[in-house]
A protein has these predicted regions:
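C-terminal His-loop and adjacent cap/lid subdomain of alpha/beta-hydrolase
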Residues: 1-182
Length: 182
């Protein structure tokens, strides 16, 4: 999954997810102002892995009970031309390829599963580097532009089999309620 880490901010946000849809907006806001963890040097990853993992669990159950295979994703892009392999990054610093979510296709931050330092388990949390207000304004001159790009990415996720429709609705609602753009 592009832009995710082994553990992320949803570990804390998920405790407040009561199914009402407010967790989507909390997750989007966390992209803009990522939380930290005690002992970790940088704000933790706020990628949207939990939505894709929810879909994967559904797809696994469906495969086991009906034989319908889950969706297959392209691999994360890796450059092996140097002395050590490195991820291929887009203009925003997010990895290319893999399962895509709105957080990497309509980005408001650079998301990585790498680069976290600090105490004990910090390396599992990856990092989030929010874009500056100037960069956000250049990417999304108005709120409608952001919502359109976020919604299109969400629709691609559903069509590709990597987002569930209910999660997609929560993501789109969060984009509409956000203050991103303009």
């Amino acid at each position: 999954m592009a832009g995710t880490s082994h553990a992320d901010a949803y570990i804390g946000l998920g405790m407040t997810d009561d199914g009402s849809g407010t967790a989507g907006l909390a997750g989007l806001n966390a992209l803009l102002a990522p939380p930290t963890r005690p002992g970790c040097a940088s704000p933790v990853n706020t990628g949207q892995a939990h939505y894709v993992l929810d879909t994967a669990e559904f797809a696994l159950h469906r495969w086991a009970t009906t034989g319908i295979r889950p969706a297959r994703a392209p691999r994360l892009q890796v450059d092996t031309s140097g002395s050590a392999p490195v991820f291929v990054l887009d203009a925003h610093g997010n990895v290319e390829g893999g399962v895509r979510t709105p957080a990497v296709d309509a980005p408001v931050a650079t998301l990585s599963g790498l680069g976290q330092s600090g105490a004990s388990f910090c390396f599992l949390f990856g990092t989030t580097t929010p874009f500056t207000a100037e960069r956000l304004a250049a990417l999304y001159p108005d709120h409608a532009t952001f919502v359109t790009k976020w919604t299109a990415s969400t629709a691609r996720g559903v069509a590709s089999g990597f987002l569930r429709p209910a999660d997609a609705a929560e993501l789109v609602k969060a984009a509409r309620q956000s203050g991103v753009g303009g």
